[in-house]
Amino acid sequence: MKEPILVMMAAGMGSRYGGLKQLDPVGPDGEVILDYSLYDAYQAGFRRVVFLIKHEIEDAFKAMVGSRVPAGMEANYAFQQLDKLPEGFSVPEGRVKPWGTGHAVLCCREFLDAPFLVINADDYYGAGAFKLAYEYLRTLRGKRGEYFMVGYALKNTLTENGYVSRGVCTVNEFGFLKEVRERTHIIASCDGPLFTEDGEMYRRLPDDTTVSMNCWGFTPDFLDALAEGFVPFLNEAMENNPMKAEYYLPTAVSRQLDRHRATARVLTCPDRWYGVTYHEDRAVVAKAMLCKAEES
């Protein structure tokens, strides 16, 4: 049987932080976040990785990261291209924004012939997340319509440096995902996490609220569902928001769940999540990575 695959989404540029986050060193010896994720993934059992990047960063990315892929780990590169669209569609004049995370995974399709995990390359999920994911992926061989999400406690994902957007999850009594609701303005406070919808009135969220940090696992048939949903998305996007509409991975998952075509197990990770949303977050991540290096 083919081994589980790790997909690392490295095509994005941080809109608020600025710059190519994936290649910004945070470790004591110049390591980037992606290096730590690769190490943890390898230790968990992953032996295949697909990097999703843009053609524009290919040389810089391969020079910095390609040579640091663990020995014994097969690496492939896929490219998120704006004009990689279904027959009958073309890129609207003036559009430069990528089509979103759902489209990004579709761009990796040629390499995804086994259950796979999708993560952001500029986020650090913790060793526990990769162990949970790898073991669960191994149970999905030959199955269809069985997805999962690695969830985190909201308190373990916040920054002191500004507001964040988080997918707040509703989980049923059997541990399956019912809904992901995007909260676009959550802040950390002395009273705990607070969110606002209008910028004026803030409401409390429990510390242990399960949130999605875009760490998803899928059986290969999900790619058919992604492709199927991309067409109606494009039809609507071309009419209503041709410059900025994005096809999000959670939207495609919700579509499958709503139609009872799939289930999504929620695997709870106790680790802290680290990411660089704001420039000031880099120091926090660097400190955490130094501690990790000293422990290992």
How would you label these PLM feature ranges?
Residues 2-66, 75, 80, 114:
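N-terminal glycine-rich phosphate-binding loop and ensuing alpha1 helix
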Residues 14, 124-126:
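A short, conserved beta-strand element in the Rossmann-like catalytic core
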Residues 69-115:
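Short phosphate-binding loop-to-helix
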Residues 114-124:
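Short beta-strand-to-loop acidic/aromatic patch adjacent to the donor-nucleotide binding site
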Residues 127-213, 220:
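Conserved core of the sugar-phosphate nucleotidyltransferase
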Residues 215-227:
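Conserved nucleotide-sugar donor-binding
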Residues 227-261:
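A C-terminal functional module that forms or caps the active site or interfaces directly
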